[in-house]
Amino acid sequence: MVESTGARATEARISRLLDLFCCAGGAGVGYKQVGFEVVGVDINPQPNYPLPFIQADALTLDPAFMASFDAIHASPPCQAYSDLAKRNRNGDSWPRLIEPVRDILARTGLPYVIENVDGAPLQNPVVLCGTMFPELRVIRHRLFEANFPIVMPPHGAHPLVHTFDRRKNHYGKTDERKDYVQVTGGGNCTIVAAREAMGINWMTKREINEAIPPAYTRFIGKQLAAYLAAQKMQEGEHTAVEYRRLAS
């Protein structure tokens, strides 16, 4: 039996992922490392985004364009849900986009992930922490909501964190090139230490302060890739059964 070139090409096609609210690409690069073909979308210019990029409003994208992808990741603005907004009581100054983003993603029918900070109104989220990844030296809790199963790794104890921020109870200088560091505007670790701690080598300090480590989405991306592969296998089995039924 000769297998058609078209069939082989379809079977070997790389899965495409749409990275919404992509900023400088912490999430997108993690998916890329798994093997996804990633396209980023952000309403603001992102000159340091290291993958194909489209400047556009994620809330008004053409549904047909979104449907051309296999999965979608979204990191809507987190400021309204942040600890800082709660302390300053100014959360209403920022847009709350999780609900409208969820509605848009659900309508696509595609597997999706929504990422945000602790306290964000995500549904049954998985929590990822830097302590779960040996290559990282940040705490960096982030929530991930998905419409496919994600297994969370064990969550270990938090080590002491290097920071210059006097508001933190772990204030004090140690060795920022070896210890855990606070990668935020108030943490004030150097850009070199921040890049090493986060596994990111292409962002500015301001960009990295708002980023998630690629290790997080690399971890989720592996499970997403397995989910997509299982879906394709089921679709193939269904097609084979239907073919046999029609041919009988």
Model region roles, listed by residue range:
Residues M1, R16-D19, V192:
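Exposed boundary/loop context
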Residues I14-S15, N88:
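Short, contiguous strand/loop micro-motifs
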Residues R16-D62, H73-A74, Y81:
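SAM cofactor-binding core of SAM-dependent methyltransferases
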Residues D42, Q55-A71, C78-E242:
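Class I S-adenosyl-L-methionine
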Residues M1-I14, T60, A229-S248:
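Short intrinsically disordered terminal tails
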Residues A9, K32, P45-P47, A120, ...:
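A generic structural signal for short, solvent-exposed coil/turn residues
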